[in-house]
Amino acid sequence: MNHCFTPSMPYRRTPAVQARLDAQRASVVEAALGLLAEQGYAGCTMAAVATRAGIATGSVYRHFPSKAELAVELFRTVVGREVAAVSEAAGHPGHGSAAERVVAVIETFAQRALKSPRLAYALLAEPVDPAVDAERLVFRRAFRDVFAARVAEGVRTGELPPQDPALTASALVGAGAEALVGPLAEGAVGPDTVPALVTFTLRALGVPDADHA
């Protein structure tokens, strides 16, 4: 006897189902971001995220199979926002001097960190999964590139003395992060922190009379 088999068709989500899943995923990320800003990575458990989002814990795992994967998504989301903010603040060549554009980067980063200290500490230094540590390197490179582009433009136009833009940029990123980590962790950022960072930045760039800029 001949049997005729009809191959099964692969399941395809309808646009409506996909839209609901996308909306739920977005709500999970926003809930997790809220917890991250309040309690850091330590308080951003899958169960807590589910409660904040108003869904079952299993639904969170549907979108993010592990806390590490959720943490990486959060890190990328926050970093994307921060890099966009400092890039906008830095402006474009011709909008202010090169030194002013570099200073705008460090000022914007520091001021945003002070407005959300718990989130900034999580971004910069909170002990987390190795996967997030790897993302931190990407984050530092992204900020370095923003700095380096402005430094290179200043060197090219003669506004800044000759220097290695990538090296200067890396030093500024490292110094800025290190200067903020301790105060953010202790909740004791003084009013002179940002002005001191600006002065340091101008000196690092080789700007004459940096103390009076």
Each model region followed by its residue ranges:
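N-terminal intrinsically disordered/low-complexity leader segments
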Residues: 1-23, 211-213
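Helix-turn-helix
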Residues: 27, 35-69, 73
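Amphipathic alpha-helical packing segments from all-alpha helical-bundle domains
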Residues: 80-84, 111-115, 131-156, 166-170, ...
